[in-house]
Regions:
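Class I S-adenosyl-L-methionine
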Residues: 1-113, 122, 144
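Active-site glycine-centered loops adjacent to acidic/histidine catalytic or metal-binding residues
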Residues: 117
């Protein structure tokens, strides 16, 4: 957005960013869809689509969040310039793993309202009073394990791993031990 567009759009909500967990029947999604102003434009990953599909209007447009992310950002930008409002579904807290941060960095002046869903690492950090920056958080949820490999090879002292239900805890432990044999349980 150009400076003039940013000034004119100040205070307007362009994107509602909705954090979710893996619950196949989320109670908050239907309420949010019914109560926020939107233009039947929705977005998220494949997994998010499968979860929210029953709650979407029949004429909903879905923008899949996938690589290359620049294509998604271009589509968001086009819609926002047309004055459209997008409802975007993401895992957990949109600022914790970054889609909201990506939007902030790349689409200057875009107004967002964020509804986070705190993930298990965040809840653990709160319970144990660990500052987020002291834990190297890695997500292997629907992603390859490259970031976990890197964290292990860098001997990060505290690694928090967000995962799907599969692979199992035993599999994740074996992975950690295979890279860092001195690791104990």
């Amino acid at each position: 957005m150009r400076t003039q567009e940013i000034v004119e759009a100040y205070g307007k909500t362009h994107i509602y960013m909705i954090g979710m967990d893996d619950n196949p029947q989320p109670k908050h999604i239907e309420v949010i869809i019914k109560n926020v102003k939107h233009d039947n434009i929705f977005s998220g990953g494949k997994r998010h689509y499968e979860i929210v599909k029953p709650f979407l209007p029949a004429d909903a447009v879905w923008i899949e969040i996938k690589a290359p992310i620049n294509a998604v950002l271009t589509e968001y930008s086009r819609l926002i310039q047309e004055g459209k409002v997008i409802v975007s579904f993401v895992s957990g807290d949109p600022f914790f793993f970054g889609f909201a941060s990506t939007i902030r960095k790349n689409l200057l002046g875009v107004g967002m309202k964020v509804f986070p869903y705190f993930n298990s690492l965040q809840m653990f950090a709160h319970h144990e009073q660990i500052p987020y920056e002291n834990m190297h958080a890695v997500s292997v949820t629907g992603r390859p394990w490259h970031e976990l490999d890197r964290a292990l090879l860098e001997y990060r002292p505290l690694i928090g791993v967000l995962t799907d239900r599969a692979p199992s805890a035993r599999c994740r432990r074996s992975k950690c031990l295979s890279i860092s044999p001195s690791t104990t349980t």
